[in-house]
């Protein structure tokens, strides 16, 4: 990956103050997306067709990737001269706030439906998985708000993360993943040749362990117990316990099945995102033993239109990692970034099939590394396979140090 990415200005629509965000009103799609399970239930009530229980599944894994293919990519950027104005425009932040009660509404209405309406096993499962997808993407809202410094924003992040029971993301992502990304120390960075299933077994427990350890260290410095209510991992966990206990009390024992299914599939959405966002990428280890500062080319990027519009621009992940506090409406594309072949929903689906995923991504990783296999994070035991596949020879002792 060439270094001119650090010096070339990003592409912009216009270098003047007359810039208009053409997607300004389209961002409402990110707000409406969490309501899709409710829309599906309305369609079931009006038509009697069970297929609508799986509306989110159909849209997420089918229609959205199709629209991404049809619409292609949007490379336009706001000129830097208007970014301060965009960042101060409350409209964009209000949209993120609005998604929070919608996530709660989708959860409560779905819980009410399965406990009061006649529903078969497959319909039950389809609704639980559909809810899991949109509530997994509550993590996306929590991601956007959790990077902000305002107390209100940070509490809104904790509230929305509580919906899917993944409150430790608030600490793990900001203080752990952003520090260690694209290094062997990061459980949320996948290795070339690693399947999503293998990745999940180290990413999910590794994320919680890192978050808890970071909070334990912070509270210790403040002279407080890790079990203090100041623990920002415990805070959203308590919210989840209260929320789920209330749902169980109101809607009965079916919640003991329904809630874990939607929660598990919600967690799977984050695992899928982490899996594709930095697959195989590696920051250079410097002579002093530290890793180079992360740059835009240490994240896979996607400019696909439809999926970005329902994900608050999450797929412009390269600029996000380089500038974590930059809001979604201001995120930029750069020249010469590592690029995913399609948007996140399509890549999430492909990731279910490891051979298919590797066939799409491994050549891209090698191209990113300019054919130098030593610049790639590779799954242990797979190095010889890739040396033979690409006809290259790596060093005898590649850096595979993993934090304990």
From Swiss-Prot:
Compartments it resides in = Cell inner membrane
The record lists the catalysed reaction(s) as: octane + 2 reduced [rubredoxin] + O2 + 2 H(+) = 2 oxidized [rubredoxin] + octan-1-ol + H2O
**This protein's superkingdom?**
Bacteria
Q: What induces it?
A: Induced by AlkS and n-alkanes.
| Cofactor or coenzyme needed | Fe(3+)
Which PANTHER family does the protein's record reference? ALKANE 1-MONOOXYGENASE 1
What is the role of this chain?
Catalyzes the hydroxylation of n-alkanes and fatty acids in the presence of a NADH-rubredoxin reductase and rubredoxin. It preferably hydroxylases C5-C12 hydrocarbons.
- Record pathway: Hydrocarbon metabolism; alkane degradation
Name one cellular component (GO) term. plasma membrane
EC number(s): the record gives 1.14.15.3
Q: Which family does it belong to?
A: Belongs to the fatty acid desaturase type 1 family. AlkB subfamily.
Bound how, and how many: what does the cofactor note say? Answer: Binds 2 Fe(3+) ions per subunit.
* Amino-acid positions noted as binding Fe cation 2 in the UniProt annotation, renumbered to this chain: 178, 317, 320-321
Quote the record's binding site residues for Fe cation 1. 143, 147, 173, 177
This protein's gene is called alkB1
| GO molecular function annotation | alkane 1-monooxygenase activity; metal ion binding
Among the record's GO biological process terms, what is one? alkane catabolic process
Is Glycoprotein one of the keywords UniProt gives this record?
A: no
Q: What class of enzyme is it?
A: oxidoreductase
Transmembrane intervals: 25-45, 47-67, 94-114, 119-139, 151-171, 241-261
The record's annotation in InterPro entries points to: AlkB/XylM (IPR033885), FA_desaturase_dom (IPR005804)
Q: Which organism is it from?
A: Alcanivorax borkumensis (strain ATCC 700651 / DSM 11573 / NCIMB 13689 / SK2)
Query: Which keywords does the record carry?
Result: Cell inner membrane, Cell membrane, Iron, Membrane, Metal-binding, Monooxygenase, Oxidoreductase, Transmembrane, Transmembrane helix
Database matches in CDD domains: Alkane-hydroxylase
Name of the protein in question: Alkane 1-monooxygenase 1
């Amino acid at each position: 990956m060439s270094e001119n990415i650090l010096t070339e200005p990003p592409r912009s629509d216009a270098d003047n103050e007359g810039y208009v965000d053409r997607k300004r009103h389209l961002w409402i799609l990110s707000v409406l997306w969490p309501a899709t399970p409710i829309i599906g239930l309305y369609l079931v009530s009006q038509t009697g067709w069970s297929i609508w229980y799986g509306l989110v599944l159909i849209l997420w894994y089918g229609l959205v990737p199709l629209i991404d293919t049809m619409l292609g990519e949007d490379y336009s950027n706001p000129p830097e001269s208007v970014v301060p104005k965009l960042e101060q425009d409350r409209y964009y932040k209000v949209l993120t706030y609005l998604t929070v009660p919608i996530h709660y509404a989708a959860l409560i209405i779905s819980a009410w439906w399965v406990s009061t309406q006649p529903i078969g096993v497959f319909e039950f499962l389809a609704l639980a998985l559909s809810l899991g997808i949109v509530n997994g993407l509550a993590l996306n809202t929590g991601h956007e708000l959790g990077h902000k410094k305002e107390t209100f924003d940070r509490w809104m992040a904790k509230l929305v993360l509580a919906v899917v029971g993944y409150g430790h993301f608030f600490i793990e992502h900001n203080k752990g993943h952003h520090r260690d990304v694209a290094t062997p120390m990061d459980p949320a960075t996948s290795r070339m040749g690693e399947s999503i299933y293998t990745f999940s077994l180290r990413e999910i427990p590794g994320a919680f362990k890192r978050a808890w350890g970071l909070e334990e260290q912070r509270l210790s410095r403040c002279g407080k117990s890790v079990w203090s209510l100041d623990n920002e991992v415990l805070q959203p966990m308590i919210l989840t316990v209260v929320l789920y206990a209330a749902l169980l009390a109101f809607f009965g024992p079916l919640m003991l099945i329904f809630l874990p299914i939607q929660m598990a599939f919600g967690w799977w959405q984050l695992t899928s995102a982490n899996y594709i966002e930095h697959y195989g990428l590696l920051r250079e280890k410097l002579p002093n033993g530290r890793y180079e500062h992360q740059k835009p080319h240490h994240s896979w990027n996607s400019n696909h239109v439809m999926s970005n519009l329902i994900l608050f621009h999450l797929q412009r992940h390269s600029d996000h990692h380089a500038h974590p506090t930059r809001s979604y409406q201001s995120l930029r594309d750069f020249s010469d970034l590592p690029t995913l072949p399609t948007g996140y929903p399509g890549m999430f689906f492909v990731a279910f099939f490891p051979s298919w995923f590797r066939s799409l991504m491994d050549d891209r990783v090698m191209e990113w590394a300019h054919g130098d296999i030593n610049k790639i994070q590779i799954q242990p035991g797979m190095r010889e396979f890739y040396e033979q596949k690409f006809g290259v020879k790596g060093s005898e002792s590649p850096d595979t140090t993993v934090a304990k």
